[in-house]
Amino acid sequence: MARITAEDCNKIIPDRFRLVVLATRYAKLLNYKVETNQIKKEKRDKPPVISLRRIAAGKVSVPQLEQDLINSLRTRMMIEPLINQDESEDVEEKFEYLPEVYIGEDYSDLDDQIFINENGEDYETDK
């Protein structure tokens, strides 16, 4: 890909994993935000390469990009409890037709099961 650009970015952001996360975030921002004038100049390159080049050139504020990433990952609304009493009863009613299955700890209940490999042939379980 852009090895020279990634090596240049390592001078600014020494941790590769952090670099990948921040460059990905900035590339997504390039795709979603309106920066058409700047992107048209670099039209032949894709957003990940553009973001790496801008990070290497120091055109991107790394602390601000980190803060933007953290803000995007935060949950902004409270999550309701996943299980309501009414909903759990409805789920039980929907699955009443399914047979109850018990598998013992020694898995002896599976001895009479048929296992088929990817060729459609039965596995030999006596081996």
From Swiss-Prot:
Domain of life of the source: Bacteria
InterPro entries associated with the record: DNA-dir_RNA_pol_omega, Pol_omega/Rpo6/RPB6, RPB6/omega-like_sf
Description of how the protein assembles with itself and partners: The RNAP catalytic core consists of 2 alpha, 1 beta, 1 beta' and 1 omega subunit. When a sigma factor is associated with the core the holoenzyme is formed, which can initiate transcription.
Protein name: DNA-directed RNA polymerase subunit omega
SMART domains: RNA_pol_Rpb6
Record's keyword annotation contains Transferase: yes
Any single GO CC term annotated in Swiss-Prot or TrEMBL for this entry: DNA-directed RNA polymerase complex
Task of the protein: Promotes RNA polymerase assembly. Latches the N- and C-terminal regions of the beta' subunit thereby facilitating its interaction with the beta and alpha subunits.
